[in-house]
């Protein structure tokens, strides 16, 4: 059995060495949180240095706006050898109209794809929507 985890990457946990797929998702400016770069550096360095198992490490930044996109570029520059994902954010967590929400999310996804296509820095990133939101909207418990 393979085990995957996603964490914001702000605090080292020894059990991360037992995980097969680790996605580090530092919080962008829109979250109101500050990134502890030294903690993130340490986590990535420790995971990469551990040769006891084959492990996939990746980074993901959720992008809501231009400031988040600039932050994502900074993260990608800082860790160029780590597979990198961009994901659109859902700012409208109260909307119960799934079709309207999907239209907004797809519009944001189109914007993000266009921004990445225009940026040489982001030529090798993977771009994803929030699949659970596209499927179920803001429904809880799914």
Located regions from the model:
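Conserved AdoMet/S-adenosylmethionine-binding subsite of the radical SAM
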Residues: 1-142
């Amino acid at each position: 059995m393979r085990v995957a985890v996603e964490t914001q990457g702000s605090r080292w946990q020894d059990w991360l060495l037992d995980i097969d797929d680790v996605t580090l998702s530092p919080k962008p400016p829109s979250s109101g949180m500050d990134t502890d770069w030294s903690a993130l550096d340490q986590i990535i360095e420790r995971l990469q240095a551990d040769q006891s198992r084959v492990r996939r490490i990746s980074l993901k930044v959720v992008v809501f706006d231009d400031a988040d996109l600039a932050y994502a570029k900074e993260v990608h520059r800082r860790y160029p050898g780590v597979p990198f994902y961009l994901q659109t954010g859902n700012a409208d967590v109260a909307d119960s109209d799934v079709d309207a929400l999907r239209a907004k999310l797809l519009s944001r996804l189109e914007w993000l794809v266009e921004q990445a296509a225009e940026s040489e820095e982001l030529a090798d990133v993977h771009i994803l929507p929030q699949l659970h939101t596209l499927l179920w909207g803001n429904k809880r418990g799914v």
